[in-house]
Amino acid sequence: MEVLMAERADLVFHNKVIDGTAMKRLISRLIDHFGMAYTSHILDQVKTMGFQQATATSISLGIDDLLTIPSKGWLVQDAEQQSLILEKHHHYGNVHAVEKLRQSIEIWYATSEYLRQEMHPNFRMTDPSNPVHIMSFSGARGNASQVHQLVGMRGLMSDPQGQMIDLPIQSNLREGLSLTEYLISCYGARKGVVDTAVRTSDAGYLTRRLVEVVQHIVVRRTDCGTIRGISVSPRNGIGMTEKMLIQTLIGRVLADDIYMGLRCIAARNQDIGVGLVNRFIAFRAQSIYIRTPFICRSTSWICRLCYGRSPTHGDLVELGEAVGIIAGQSIGEPGTQLTLRTFHTGGVFTGGTAEHVRAPFNGKIKFNEDLVHPTRTRHGHPAFLCYIDLYVTIESQDILHNVNIPPKSFLLVQNDQYVESEQVIAEIRARTSTFNFKERVRKHIYSDSEGEMHWSTDVYHAPEYTYGNVHLLPKTSHLWILSGGPRRSSLVPFSLHKDQDQMNIHSLSVEQRESSDLSVTNDRARHKLFSSDPSGKKEGKILDYSGPARIISNGHWNFIYPAILHENSYLLAKRRRNRFIIPFQYDQEREKELMPRSGISIEIPINGILRRNSILAYFDDPRYRRSSSGITKYGTVEVDSIVKKEDLIEYRGAKEFSPKYQMKVDRFFFIPEEVHILPGSSSIMVRNNSIIGVDTRITLNTRSRIGGLVRVERKKKRIELKIFSGDIHFPGEADKISRHSGILIPPGTGKKNSKESKKLQNWIYVQRITPTKKKYFVSVRPVVTYEIADGINLATLFPQDLLQERDNVKFRVVNSILYRNGKPIRGIYYTSIQLVRTCLVLNWDQDRNGSIEKVKASIVEVRANDLIRDFIRIDLVKSPISYTGKRNDMAGSGLIPDNGSDHTNINPFYSKVRRIQSLTQHQGTIRTLLNRNKECQSFLILSSSNCSRIGPFNGSKSHNVTKESIQIKEDPMIPIRNSLGPLGTVPKIANFDSPYYLITHNQILLNKYLLLDNLKQTFQVLKYYLMDENGRIYNPYPCRNIIFHPFDLTWCFLHHDYCEKTSTIIVLGQFICENENVCISKYGPQIKSGQVLIVHVDSLVIRSAKPHLATPGATVHGHYGEILYEGDTLVTFIYEKSRSGDITQGLPKVEQVLEVRSVDSISMNLEKRVEGWNEHIKRILGIPWGFLIGAELTIAQSRISLVNKIQKVYRSQGVQIHNRHIEIIVRQITSKVLVSEDGMSNVFSPGELIGLLRAERTGRSLEEAICYRAILWGITRASLNTQSFISEASFQETARVLAKAALRGRIDWLKGLKENVVLGGMIPVGTGFKGLVHRSRQDNNIPLEIKKKNLFEGEIRDILFHHRELFGSCIPNNFHNTPEQ
């Protein structure tokens, strides 16, 4: 009795609620004290009592018990307010898209967590006996997070890929979800039908493969006699918490005696219990060697001591226990359970979210300022960081409240600041969990409006895309999308150009994505398709002329050039020295009478350079146009080609010639015929040499258009069918016509001896046709005669004073026939063929030094009042200049910068060097125009790409810019690039004292403030040249015309006293962000963000633009100045995020590790290290030892890291799996080695797979070195490479496995469980056969082993300590391995 009393006195008296963890502790202590049987009896009583009480209490759960937390309303409102501010910052361009996503997720996550914490006190205060409250905090299945969804808010969900959906579900399940919320919640729910089915099957399959690998592992012996061990260090080393250490050690068996000084505190082969672990921790033992399944010396089973305690009853595992199957199931089973958990309903960024501390009431904050340091939060907001515990006092009128803020937290308020109730005063940083998987994610940002791209910093070409349009940002900057769509119609829009204003040639062309309305008439396209070259071959390359813009892509830009400008117009000429201008004058009435469809076409080659004898313009006379096929004949007329070979027009690389034949005669003939080209397989309904009428069916779906003689010629793959109209003459003696063949007969020759001797009215063409050898007849075909008029009609086309040019530029008008004599011309149906073309040929006198080889043509538009005129301007280019231009042109496009010849004429003493210098400074033509009433106030518009540079004057004295304007007297080419950095960087609004100037063409200084008239029309802004990083000049997108609609422009009125008040100067072309406090508007400080387009005395016009912030390393897509459409990719961010620790992502991770196929898998890193080790160790220890220890080390390392990886996933889920289960599996997938080719052995052939232990033993017994290297199997491959073919066949690929086994004559010894189950035998496991093992044999072995051990241990440990440094990087430092001798 006394003993009992004494025992009772030792026991602890519990008087509190026992939850799950307390229950676990109680049971384990009961087992320690009383053993299994007694404990189960006690627990039975507890269970019975529990059920009785529950029945008596009769807890029921109704929907009314779900009480929504009252603080939810304002919490959600608060979060919405924060999201709104965030959205605004994103709109201003202060926060980029990824930051916005992160912050919004954090805002909602923090809100949801705070609600969850509020839930418990709320229930405790309002309704402590509420059944929901009792159940949720009972510690039974079900936890706060589910209740939180019922009464708090459902929160953030992740989609099936584990990405966050940044739209939170604000309702809870008690209030009910809206439709959107319901759909989102279906995504994230782990209970979704699809999800559960798919995940469960995955988990099931994982279990099946695991069991397959280890089913044959059974405990067969008590001790295998191994002398190795794995060291675990109880000193709180890296990554080993005390809890993990206890988990690792308890239930294991010691591999070595442990000494504390000279005293042995634990012996070898002793199993470790709680007491022993506590002693180790107290004594801080250096390192503890334990036995694990890894080091067991048996191949296909395991011994009791290496396995350790059985998890079921806490003693050493019994012989005959099927530990393999238990291991497989313990790893696979949690998977199936975890899929069904609504474990973690969102929060990808949980790793870094912070808890908020809120003020309990209104009051003043007090804290010690010496203990905090100013810093910024991770979102860049100012805060205080406290390094140690900080006590914050909040005092209101009658209450004092103390809040303790833990170290490393952020304080978000100032000292002595007044805070309102529930205001966030501090953020407690979450301890970052070490188990989150980081992954790099690319996020594409898409443009949400169409417009023109612009960036405000230099960008680099990504090295792998040197010729593409992928650019890397070197520093944080804004990308701007300037609003304004591309020009969509070819109507001339309201133009901003005034009189004498120069324009670029490319403005007449059309935007790339729209097909052109200026499109070329069909006949023009016809010539291109059928232009023939002198050798008579068909033109190989058919050019596509859907619009006049030809697209040429080269290295850096995609140039689009107008090839032809097709205008119905007259040419009037206006002359200056060395420059020649032809205006096109639109003349509506005359046009209708004279030229219904065709007009003068001007052809300027792509690069704008014309050579000698080039054709500048041509006119297609409608009289020389045919709609049917036929042959042209000149008779015996001599013709010579105008275009000589060396004068070919060069089209970038591809020489393309369409020779024109100049004629010495005034007439030519056209013989019409109808031609059908049919595929070889078609059936023809008419016979060769038969005569048909009009509209006869030739094939199923073609009919003839004329009547006459049919000729059918079969070529290789097609049939050519021609129909000749005209008479047929059979040969008679008296008929002279029939004697001729293939000639033209002029009118006036009569038929003699016929009834009426009739004269021929027209020319005819006689052709002999021979159907058979003896017979022949003659087809007489009508001929159309064309008279070619002399220069009479040419004078009306091209004005006379143009042709009588007194300058050194010469023009002559030439008629040319487009087809050679006798050449058959094919027409495509419903299109016409032009036979003769009138050309304007350009030539010029040689200079004395003969340096002018080519001229540069450009088109100039001048608008006077409401009449717009276009001029062609031809500049004679001196060849050194063009050479410089070419060499400066990086892409080699041959585009010469438009520096015109004006400067050459202004200053005739330019040398070559000077010319190069001016090239780099010249930025192209900038349009300037005087107002009609000739006031001093000029009017100026910025070209859209901000290419005109604005720089301060050199000699300026004035500050009040509005009243003074200075005349420039210096060189107008002031190099401003040096002062302002390369083009494309935008100067910030700064405090410049001097007025600004633009480099203008006519050297009239513009005043800064300009007037915009008639803003309501849509108008067009053109682009000019752009300088790239090397100072070369480009015109990147010559064909783009941007049209603004009125709502793209904002008109800001300035304060009347603006200049005196602020020092800010608004610069033309400057970008303004919406929130930069540019206080200039009358109606308030806000300007919409955009680019300043027009500056006026009292107002500005801003082209609205949307800024996107981009961080360094982001990839920008597209080119500077490119037009982007809605939905185009703008920029790609790369950022790291932590995967949700959700099992949906967890299971694939486990599977990846077990199948050894993860990208960052151990195999990748280890392969390299292993080779290094093998080399070093071989050098130190010689061949046999080297291979042995090299493979040992490899396998030991990879095993440890595999175990750690798998444990990581499960621990992050809160699932406890004992290491030894994982070890058994990992041991199986790392137990094979590959015989390498380094040394030939008599036993194994190279490339053969053998068990590691077998290789070691064979090597020892043969005393010869076997060279092998470690190999990692996945579980599937390991299952298909076991000792038993029956178990392999029952797993996968049955037929293949059985066939191979039969061919090899494999024998199955039926050692495993599965083979016996398949064949219906008894399985070789079960804990009944203790007496079978002879104890004596094992006892004899032990002393011998220990002797051996002492010999080798010292040396080998030294070697391994040396090698620990080698592989220390890939595993935790607390493991190292002692291999066998």
From Swiss-Prot:
Q: SUPFAM superfamilies per the record?
A: beta and beta-prime subunits of DNA dependent RNA-polymerase
Per the record, its GO cellular-component terms are: chloroplast; DNA-directed RNA polymerase complex; mitochondrion
Keywords linked to the UniProt accession? Chloroplast, DNA-directed RNA polymerase, Metal-binding, Nucleotidyltransferase, Plastid, Transcription, Transferase, Zinc
Report the HAMAP family cross-referenced here. RNApol_bact_RpoC2
Q: Looking at the keywords, is Ligase present?
A: no
Subcellular location, record wording? Plastid, Chloroplast
Please give the Pfam families that the UniProt record associates with this protein. RNA_pol_Rpb1_4, RNA_pol_Rpb1_5
Main localisation? plastid
Top EC group: transferase
Which region is the signal sequence? none
Per UniProt, Zn(2+) binds at: 224, 296, 303, 306
Outline the subunit composition. In plastids the minimal PEP RNA polymerase catalytic core is composed of four subunits: alpha, beta, beta', and beta''. When a (nuclear-encoded) sigma factor is associated with the core the holoenzyme is formed, which can initiate transcription.
Family statement = Belongs to the RNA polymerase beta' chain family. RpoC2 subfamily.
Q: What does this protein do?
A: DNA-dependent RNA polymerase catalyzes the transcription of DNA into RNA using the four ribonucleoside triphosphates as substrates.
Q: Which organism is it from?
A: Drimys granadensis
The encoding gene: rpoC2
Q: What is this protein called?
A: DNA-directed RNA polymerase subunit beta''
Q: Is the keyword Ribosomal protein in the record? A: no
